[in-house]
């Protein structure tokens, strides 16, 4: 059974590497201020979510969780052209998450999490995002935002991605 789990994990890892390579190619084909909404949709497909942005812009969310390490926010300006393409799972964005912040604001900032875990006895809900804190997949970490029952931030945590560690036998 343990061998089968490792085989599946290796396959999932290979798929992540291939998909992340696809993202690099897609991003290289787009240019801010030139590429259109149609260009973005042609390369990335339908967005996970669409958020209203400033001055009539729209922000498209392209989620790579749970297996990937990125979430992209692509801003389409009121003129229909791509104004920005950002990978949002970064320590700089994590530092912007503050106690009391509503879940919706965190969700707009970081995109859909890889996992949501309620802890009823603690009256907490943990939202987890997998990200890379360096150039290698061995640098993978998990950023956790802990919410109360009112879906307001209590605290944040960062830990090594448990998927990197083999299970105990």
Task: Please annotate each region the language model reported.
Residues 1-20:
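Sec-dependent bacterial lipoprotein signal peptides
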């Amino acid at each position: 059974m343990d061998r089968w789990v490792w085989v599946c994990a290796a396959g999932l890892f290979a798929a992540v590497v291939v998909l992340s390579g696809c993202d690099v190619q897609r991003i290289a084909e787009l240019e801010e201020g030139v590429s259109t909404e149609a260009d973005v949709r042609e390369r990335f497909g339908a967005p996970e979510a669409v958020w209203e942005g400033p001055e009539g812009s729209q922000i498209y969310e392209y989620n790579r969780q749970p297996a990937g390490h990125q979430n992209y926010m692509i801003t389409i300006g009121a003129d229909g052209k791509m104004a920005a393409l950002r990978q949002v799972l970064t320590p700089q964005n994590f530092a912007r998450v503050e106690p009391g912040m509503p879940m919706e604001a965190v969700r707009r900032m970081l995109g859909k999490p890889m996992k949501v875990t309620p802890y009823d006895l603690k009256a907490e809900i943990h939202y987890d995002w997998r990200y890379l804190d360096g150039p290698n997949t061995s640098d993978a970490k998990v950023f956790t935002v802990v919410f109360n029952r009112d879906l307001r931030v209590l605290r944040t945590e960062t830990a090594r991605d448990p998927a990197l560690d083999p299970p105990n036998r």
